[in-house]
Regions:
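Electrostatic cytochrome c docking/interface patches
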Residues: 15-31
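Sec-exported extracytoplasmic/periplasmic mature domains
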Residues: 33, 37, 80-84, 128-132
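The canonical Cys-X-X-Cys-His
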Residues: 28, 32-42, 92, 123, ...
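Extracytoplasmic electron-transfer domains, predominantly the class I c-type cytochrome c fold
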Residues: 53-112, 123
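C-terminal partner/receptor-binding element of secreted or periplasmic proteins
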Residues: 118-133
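Detector for the c-type heme attachment site
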Residues: 19, 39-46, 97, 128
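Sec-dependent bacterial lipoprotein signal peptides
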Residues: 1-16
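An acidic site on a long C-lobe helix of protein kinase domains
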Residues: 24, 71, 115-119
Length: 133
């Protein structure tokens, strides 16, 4: 009886536990439209309203996944500021809000699930969804 009760209790607790769902591209698109569109443009082509005044021009974000290889770790490091080239004009603005809040387990290509701020993971999902051949 005790074993059955513990099993039932375990099932009930498992059903009650909430797990963070992985962000989908539409969630990331909203973040993109709020933070990235001025430089990278509405379609991610690097042609936003501020792009003409920038040197070098913003990257075409639809071409990040060359040959079907989407470099998740590299893209995250550029967005969050770890990948600074030191070259003038290559800096991304600071996106402090993208680095806060709930985290989700994200595999950036090395097979390791890394706790990643949900907004950052959502933006990554959106960028991956707009890749062109």
């Amino acid at each position: 009886v005790i074993r059955v009760s513990l099993t039932v209790l375990g099932v009930v607790l498992a059903a009650c536990a909430t797990t963070a769902s992985m962000p989908e591209p539409p969630e990331g698109r909203a973040i993109y439209m709020e933070n990235c569109v001025q430089c990278h443009g509405p379609a991610g082509k690097g042609d936003g309203p501020w792009a003409a005044a920038m040197a070098p021009a913003p990257s075409d974000l639809t071409q990040l996944g060359v040959n079907g290889d989407f470099p998740r770790a590299r893209i995250l490091s550029v967005i969050d500021g770890y990948d600074r080239t030191g070259l003038p004009g290559k800096e991304m603005p600071e996106f402090g809000a993208l680095l806060k809040g709930e985290t989700v387990p994200l595999d950036v290509g090395d097979g390791v699930l890394t706790p990643t701020p949900r907004p950052l993971a959502a933006l990554l999902a959106y960028l991956e969804s707009i890749q062109e051949p």
